[in-house]
Amino acid sequence: MEYLVSKGEMPLEDKLNILTDAAKYDVACTSSGVDRKGDGKSIGNCVAAGICHSFSGDGRCISLLKILMTNECIFDCKYCRNRRSNDVPRATFTPEEICTLTMEFYRRNYIEGLFLSSGIIGNPTFTQELICRTVWLLRNRYRFNGYVHVKAIPGAAPEIIQQTGFLVDRMSVNLELPTAEGLRSLAPNKHRKSILTPMRQIQTGIQVNRNDLVLYRNAPKFVGGGQSTQMIIGATPESDYQIINVAESLYQKFDLKRVFYSAFVNVTGDKSLPALPGGPPLLREHRLYQADWLLRFYGFRAEELLDEKRPYFNVMLDPKEDWAVRHLERFPVEINRAPLEELLRVPGIGVKSAGRIVAARRSGSLTFPDLKKIGVVLKRALYFITCSGRMMYPVKIEEDYIVRNLTTEKDRVRFGSDGMSYKQLSLFDDVEFTRPVTVIERQQAAVGQL
């Protein structure tokens, strides 16, 4: 098929400015799980692809070129900056232009790979063909062997999605909003079924490919890094309980690698969108990520963390601490005898430290100094554990007492950023940071009051 996308008169740098800026609200990009090495013939490898592919507030260079194929779109989603009715500068890359940019940035060590999304130009199938053509050129003509993550466009022809899957490391289909009702109200052109269909196709393709790789060692990989999705949080009235249940269902039914949560930012000014006087709900986004981690790695279920009577996460305590203080009948846990499943539910004990505890206690009984060396955060764990039947200090196993002590340090909103999780570092601006961000400013940013 001929790809009738003209370069036009717009300079490439202007296109890059427009289309990197337009891509900054899509957070569903990561390269974890891909370990393809260089083959000596191609350019790039994915050995170092587990690093954080995001943008920092201190001016550090991003390692993933995150751009849109085009910000033209036939849809008119109320929350989207690139909606059809929005008056913004428009631009479209050709596949060759994206390949050129990717290779030039890679050779200069600016990036580790490519994250390519797109508005819908013409129709979904044509847009997916452009994405597929771009990646095919990168892999075959330019011999690029680095990490590539692209979008699967809902409504695109299944055979084009299939072809794309054999060329990329990860694919994602954005769920957009947690429920079908929210999607109908803010994105009337989109339908839940058309979003879930490519998710199911990718899941099936990965499973079939996994079996093929058992039989044929050199079989080509299909979406080797798995698939992910993204939900916008705060644009519609769903509770945290609804959102985390949707995420759990996606993990169970579609074998997703990641669900990303994006705090809603009103970039269109549409009057039907909620007003956010305190700014984007960044603390809520943070709590959802913490709960998501508990679902994926700690053996928790959504119904254990929240229910219809308690539909929102605690502002002051992280989800694991909140669960623990509500289930004090299960504590204290004896470190030297508790199974791994119980250790993982103790605040201050992570996956790695729980594994180290299980391994270390085979050689003898563990003490509190041993736990500190292992990596346990004792200032949180001490209320919930004993070593050889003794607690670290004589503390009360009472909910009010523990909550008071856990929330004493107000700077425990653990972002590690200034709250601007939705902002992308410009590839061109010379940003000057006149002073470091203070602890108070971090707290204000976390709760949307900065």
Language-model features and meaning:
Residues 99, 122-305:
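Conserved AdoMet/S-adenosylmethionine-binding subsite of the radical SAM
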Residues 67-96:
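Canonical Radical SAM [4Fe-4S] cluster-binding loop centered on the CxxxCxxC motif
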Residues 103-119, 291:
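Short Fe-S-cluster ligation motifs
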Residues 65-67, 96-107, 214-215:
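Short, charged beta->alpha transition segments
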Residues 64, 77, 116, 173, ...:
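Conserved, mostly hydrophobic/aromatic
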Residues 272-344, 380-429:
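Long, highly charged, low-complexity intrinsically disordered interaction regions
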Residues 1-72, 377, 385, 393-450:
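Flexible, acidic/Gly-rich N-terminal and inter-domain linker regions that tether
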